[in-house]
Amino acid sequence: MTNLKNLRGMLDLLPAQSQGWQKVESIALEHFSRAGLQEIRTPILEQTELFSRGIGENTDVVGKEMYSFDDRGGRSCTLRPEGTAPVARSIIQHGLLNNGPQRLWYRGPMFRYERPQAGRQRQFHQIGVEFVGLASVMSDAEVISIAWNFLKDVGLNDLTLEINSLGSNEDRNIFKEELKDWLNQRFDLLDEDSQKRINVNPLRILDSKNNSTKELLSEAPSLNDFLSSESKTRFDYLQELLVNLKIPYKINYNLVRGLDYYSHTAFEITSDHLGSQATVCGGGRYDGLISELGGPQAPSIGWAIGMERLVILAGDKILQTKSPDVYVIHKGKKAEQLALEITCQLRSSNLIIELDYSGSSFSKQFKRADKSRAKWALVIGEDEVSKGQLLMKKLRDKQKDEESREYIFSKGDLDQLIKKLIA
């Protein structure tokens, strides 16, 4: 019989790794709560139409990368490839904008059929923020600052913020025609993917990773030259706000986002430590998405961070596992019952308690206790039960405290002793 394994690009998150993820999520929860954000959770499975309308029929995501299928009712369904369109759908469906602008965050798995690489899998996880119903440039700056400061809270310092203005729809439409003419004159010099995109999604060519195409694009028309005075004023003010917030940035006029719904502000936060997968956070303004999906006109801005890449970058800063405060060692039937009772009692005091289940000798249990890196071992044997006593032995830093390595005490004094020994 063939051994069953996970699908390619869909990885198990093992206990040694999950603790780092939990740390990042706890930092996110605290950071976003301080920023006044509320969490929203949407289904993993959505109607395919949500993404074809919201993201754009001509994007790589919709055209090449989605996991789509017909369910047993004949409905076309898709495993969500990103989080913004589902959040937009939920806001419209439940009328959340009737209560005013929404400041939301989300987390969860996404799915894209891509070639798996370090930090990029077919099932991947994102944490994202969406400000919906806010048009102010101040909201752009605040959203960027939330991302920047969250990454700092996680412990990342070697980061680069790149920003660009994609202008209004009118700005982009004029620029697209100029860019298409320029590219068509140099068609044979473009890589194959870029040739396919000229008439479908020419702006995406600006983000080409092909070296020869990138070199050619250095002479291409710049979207910045086609921005209206209103769009330029908006972009200038964003830069002023970022300077005031002491957030360093670089302008990248070739920065475009891979989804069609973006306008005006676009940004990425990158790291040199991820190789070709340099982007840690990407986002921008999407003023037309809510109305495109059938809702009211609601200018919005948001971003998403890939958890896999974030955990890789954070490394040892978040992967330090917590050792037990107390490892409970026991031998004998009566001792077993008391050990379980005391374990549950101590856990209710917010302590990390590990209970030995091996039933082996005291010496072997002590070896496991030492391997767990617990600070103390609580020893319960038949003798201790008959005498109504418990024994606490220190496991760490023994050489520093030889005089107080052991404590013998009654069960009634347990809470008081624990408070004394484990501050």
From Swiss-Prot:
InterPro entries: aa-tRNA-synth_II, aa-tRNA-synth_II/BPL/LPL, Anticodon-bd, Anticodon-bd_dom_sf, His-tRNA-ligase, HisRS-like_core, HisRS/HisZ, HisRS_anticodon. Disulfide bonds: none annotated. Keywords: Aminoacyl-tRNA synthetase, ATP-binding, Cytoplasm, Ligase, Nucleotide-binding, Protein biosynthesis. The keyword ATP-binding applies. PROSITE patterns: AA_TRNA_LIGASE_II. It catalyses: tRNA(His) + L-histidine + ATP = L-histidyl-tRNA(His) + AMP + diphosphate + H(+). Pfam families: HGTP_anticodon, tRNA-synt_His. It comes from the Bacteria. SUPFAM superfamilies: Class II aaRS ABD-related, Class II aaRS and biotin synthetases. Gene3D superfamilies: Anticodon-binding domain, Bira Bifunctional Protein, Domain 2. One of its GO terms (biological process) is histidyl-tRNA aminoacylation. It is an enzyme of class 6 (ligase). Its main location: cytoplasm. GO terms for cellular component: cytoplasm. It is found in: Cytoplasm. GO terms for molecular function: ATP binding; histidine-tRNA ligase activity. The keyword Ligase applies. Homodimer. Belongs to the class-II aminoacyl-tRNA synthetase family. NCBIfam families: hisS. This is Histidine--tRNA ligase. The gene is hisS.
